[in-house]
């Protein structure tokens, strides 16, 4: 994995065929045979380009321009600010709270099996946790990642939120915090609240723990991919992190491992949507349908270590299946908090987090 400068350079916008796209706040419309897809940068960009974008271009004879700017919340803010015409045709990595807002504000297209025939194969859970203004193409869950060189395996979320009893002063300055624009931060705060009897309806225990944890935090970032250099250079030893990137880093010989602590975890549905003002809606729907094709699901999820968006794929390697949501039984054990509640409270939680961390 590259150092910080290389990671940043890879996060520049990729023109998957020819040329390059500058990424202002709103991207100018392109030709009808060009599709603009928004998604994450760093290793995610490398993987989706290889496993999904390049095969899609070959199959449909089109060009895909990849825009790697912004988190899910930030990209929905672009959709809102542009009244549904942000310059990208596919919002490739939203989450259920953004889909709920998109439905309420009428800024995301409703997607049915007519537009995306592969919808018939998705998990039933996907239909329950997200409105039809998007499609769940993959899943992750909140994991606790630790540096195996310096720390024993954490047993509880308390080992992160109150690290002194388990690890002593040696871990001070080696924790990372994520800003609430990243749903990773929100989920970790919910687990903090649960440690003290709270939850989404009572987050005060989380704020108390965050205030006490603050002196132990060495770095704070927004995007998940921005954390990679800190894991690699031995600066961060303990972090809440998405299972997919955790598995990717383990597979690429970072000195880390990840676990689901004894209190359990929260699942994340990774969703794709089409803004109402998208310039190339037909091709956008084709791209979302293509992401759900079995071969594409297999290639992408194996490479990124995320869980599939459909339960009918069964030929997973044993080591992959052991840490992924691949059966209805495993899906039933994952908690998905009320996304409508999260969406309504997220602004308040963000302001509280900023107040404590400033």
Question: What is each stretch, according to the model?
Answer:
Residues 42-49, 72, 87-88, 93-218, ...:
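Extracytoplasmic ligand-binding site segments that recognize negatively charged/polar headgroups
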Residues 139-140, 208-213, 221, 250-276:
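Periplasmic-binding protein-like
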Residues 143-150, 191-196, 268-281, 288, ...:
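A bilobed periplasmic-binding-protein/Venus flytrap-type ligand-binding module shared by bacterial periplasmic
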Residues 275-334:
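Mature extracytoplasmic/periplasmic domains
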């Amino acid at each position: 994995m590259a150092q910080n400068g290389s990671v940043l350079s890879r996060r520049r916008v990729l023109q998957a065929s020819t040329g390059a796209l500058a990424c202002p706040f709103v991207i100018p419309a392109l030709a009808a045979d060009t599709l603009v897809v928004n998604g994450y940068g760093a290793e995610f960009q490398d993987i989706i380009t290889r496993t999904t974008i390049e095969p899609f271009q070959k199959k449909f004879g089109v060009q895909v321009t990849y825009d790697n700017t912004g988190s899910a919340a930030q990209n929905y803010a672009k959709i809102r600010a542009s009244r549904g015409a942000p310059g990208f045709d596919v919002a490739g990595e939203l989450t259920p709270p953004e889909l709920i807002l998109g439905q309420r504000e009428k800024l995301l297209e409703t997607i049915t099996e007519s537009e995306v025939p592969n919808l018939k194969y998705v998990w039933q859970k996907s239909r329950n946790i997200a409105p039809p203004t998007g499609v769940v193409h993959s899943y992750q869950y909140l994991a606790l990642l630790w540096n195996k060189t310096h720390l024993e395996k954490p047993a509880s979320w308390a080992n992160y939120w109150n690290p002194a009893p388990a690890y002593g002063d040696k871990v001070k300055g080696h924790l990372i915090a994520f800003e609430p624009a990243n749903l990773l931060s929100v989920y970790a705060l919910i687990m903090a609240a649960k440690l003290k009897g709270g939850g989404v309806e009572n987050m005060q225990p989380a704020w108390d723990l965050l205030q006490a944890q603050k002196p132990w935090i060495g770095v704070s970032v927004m995007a998940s991919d921005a954390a990679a250099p800190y894991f690699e250079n031995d600066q961060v030893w303990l972090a809440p992190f998405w299972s997919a990137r955790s598995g990717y880093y383990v597979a690429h010989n970072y000195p880390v491992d990840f676990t689901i602590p004894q209190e359990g975890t929260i699942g994340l549905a990774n969703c794709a949507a089409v803004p109402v003002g998208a310039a190339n809606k037909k091709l956008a729907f084709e791209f979302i349908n293509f992401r759900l094709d079995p071969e594409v699901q297999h290639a992408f999820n194996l490479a990124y270590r995320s869980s599939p968006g459909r339960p009918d794929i069964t030929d997973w390697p044993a080591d992959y299946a052991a840490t992924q949501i691949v059966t209805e039984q495993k899906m039933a054990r994952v908690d998905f908090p009320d996304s409508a509640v999260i969406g309504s409270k997220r602004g308040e939680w963000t302001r509280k987090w900023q107040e404590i961390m400033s």
